Amino acid sequence: MLRDYDIIAIQEVVAGYGGAQAVARLTDELNIKGNKWDYVISDKTRSNPYKTERYAFIWNMNKLKKIGKAWLEKKYQLKIEREPFFCTFQYKNKQFTVVNFHAITKDKQPETEIKYFKFFPEEYPNLNLIFAGDFNCPQSHTVFNPLKKMGYQSILVNQKTSLRQAFKNGKCLASEFDNMYYKTSKINTINSGIIPFHKNFNSLKEARIISDHIPICFEFSLN
């Protein structure tokens, strides 16, 4: 499933040593399957010990080049519990930066964190930003309006991405939380959607051992 894509952005990597080991093992498995893959893992986020985690990127080195060092956002780290992880990649002669993010849970009001994202395009005017991850907030929320007014657009609309513990009315997806946002003047969408990996398992319980969210995907070209 993963080897069909060139970048994999991962949230909720365990902050302890085991999390980094798991990402390394996944990268090793991809290398066995073909192509040459590498990975980068963030430092621990500056959140309380019960909420801290790491982010990770895995990328296909035959297609992409990582530019410089990846970094955790510092300016708003006291405002955002798990500050986003930035990494710049180059495809041929064009660059883009993926902003990997995991928001606080819905009951904690993730919009109080997401509202700071409107400052990132001005803070990094030379970067072609793609915001990606688990926002715990639907794209229809007004907190995304400032980004939309700047020309950013979500790759998914009305697409639920979290897995229920059991089917309800024949449906297993619960909430519209995961998405990506890109600037339409700099990026063209070729394809976007979800990867319904849970259909490969005998039950939702089995699938949720892997993840309680389904992966989302974005195929694009750079202007």
Model-derived segments and spans:
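His/acidic metal-ligating clusters that form di-metal
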Residues: 111-132
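Active-site metal-binding loops of divalent metal-dependent hydrolases
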Residues: 12-13, 103, 133-135
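Metal-dependent phosphoester-hydrolase catalytic domains
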Residues: 16, 122-129, 137-223
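Surface-exposed cleft-lining segments at the edges of enzyme active sites
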Residues: 72-75, 99-108
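Loop/turn elements at helix/coil->beta-strand transitions in domains of secreted/extracellular proteins
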Residues: 3-7, 33-38, 92-97, 124-129, ...
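Structured beta-strand-rich core segments of catalytic domains in phosphoester-bond hydrolases
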Residues: 14-94
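Stable alpha-helical elements in mature extracytoplasmic
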Residues: 9, 19-26, 54, 110-117, ...
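Conserved hydrophobic/aromatic beta-strand scaffold that supports enzyme active sites
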Residues: 55-57, 84-88, 100, 179-180, ...
